[in-house]
Amino acid sequence: MSDTKRPPTLLTAADIAAIPPRQRVHQFNSNAVRLTRTLGEVVGLQRIGVHIVRLEPGRESTQFHYHDADEEFLYILEGRAIAEIGDERFEVGAGDFMGFATPSPAHTLINTFDQDLVYLMAGERNPNDIVHYPKIRRSMIKGPGVRRWFDWDALHDV
């Protein structure tokens, strides 16, 4: 089988390995540092973000959060982590899947183990969404070309 006529919709394992990982630091959590290979954009996906993420020991995947509009999922490929979902914590590992329909409980991953965690992450890219960060009492409003955040304690009744 020749790959000279391979469609632009196909990424081989070698193609994926050649995508340089980009370091992503969460805007509200400096310990949430992900090494991300973005797959969806490479094959032209516009409404779904698809990424392979590496989370080093001691790191968090994101600030504990939930979305009003975007659904997302995680599928663990390698390693272990603690999944914090709502008020509970669970150990997760290779082969485990988490899906967050809207509305969902707030969630994050914490790599408390001594090896990297690798997972497939995908989610919607709705043009409008509100992301809530309950532990830091903050929300972010996302609209076309704009992202704004506000502290819950700074809100006043009208």
Segments from the language model and where they lie:
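Short acidic-glycine-tyrosine-enriched beta hairpin
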Residues: 87-102
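Short, conserved beta-strand element in jelly-roll/cupin
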Residues: 52-56, 66-84, 122-124
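Ligand-binding loop in jelly-roll beta-barrel domains
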Residues: 44, 102-129
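Short acidic (Asp/Glu) patches
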Residues: 60, 68, 102-106
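Conserved short histidine dyad/triad with adjacent acidic residue
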Residues: 33-38, 51-67
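A short, N-terminal "cap"/entry segment at the start of jelly-roll beta-barrel domains
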Residues: 1-47, 131-158
